[in-house]
Amino acid sequence: MTEFTRHTGIVVPLDAANVDTDAIIPKQFLQKVTRSGFGRHLFHDWRFLDEAGERPNPAFVLNQPPFQQGSILLARENFGCGSSREHAPWALTDYGFRVVIAPSFADIFYGNAFNSQLLPIILDEAQIAALFTLVSASPGIAFSVDVEQQTLQAGDTRYTFTLDPFRRHCLIHGLDSIGLTLRHASAIDDYEARRPAFLR
């Protein structure tokens, strides 16, 4: 995994609450266990007018020119609810999103997001409403996120957010569960060498 310390990107306003994981990546596309290839199916039933995904829905925000290169998603409360599929953050990151900002997230999605190096930022509803107003007035605006300082710069306003210190550390240093384990490889090897032969 790569280090994630700062990110600046165009903001995509998805003005919907309770966006569930089936809306993020419909179940018919969950036929792989690798993380790549899901981006083209992100929000499939909203992005496209046909099952084959060949006719973009011009009314959906991701198909509108100011937002087509977006990498920061702005949403309403309870984002990522529904089933506990890891494919949901995989689809978001494979599409190109690095950050999702919302008043609240479903618990399982929130944890899965960090595992996929997708940063979920929680702000209160008044702050989220102000951000939607800002993006509506300036389509294509970019926000800047600083993971180390836990700040979000949106226009002339700087917001602060809180991350669990361990999750923040893992993002900054590009560590997942495997990377954390490998940091202790020598200690693991020493332990294995001391074990009785019949247990090896």
Curated annotation (Swiss-Prot):
InterPro entries: 3-IsopropMal_deHydase_ssu (IPR004431), Aconitase/3IPM_dehydase_swvl (IPR015928), AconitaseA/IPMdHydase_ssu_swvl (IPR000573), IPMI_Swivel (IPR033940), LeuD (IPR050075). Pfam families: Aconitase_C. GO terms for cellular component: 3-isopropylmalate dehydratase complex. GO terms for biological process: L-leucine biosynthetic process. It comes from the Bacteria. Its EC number is 4.2.1.33. Pathway: Amino-acid biosynthesis; L-leucine biosynthesis; L-leucine from 3-methyl-2-oxobutanoate: step 2/4. Catalyzes the isomerization between 2-isopropylmalate and 3-isopropylmalate, via the formation of 2-isopropylmaleate. Belongs to the LeuD family. LeuD type 1 subfamily. Heterodimer of LeuC and LeuD. This is 3-isopropylmalate dehydratase small subunit. It comes from Edwardsiella ictaluri (strain 93-146). The gene is leuD.
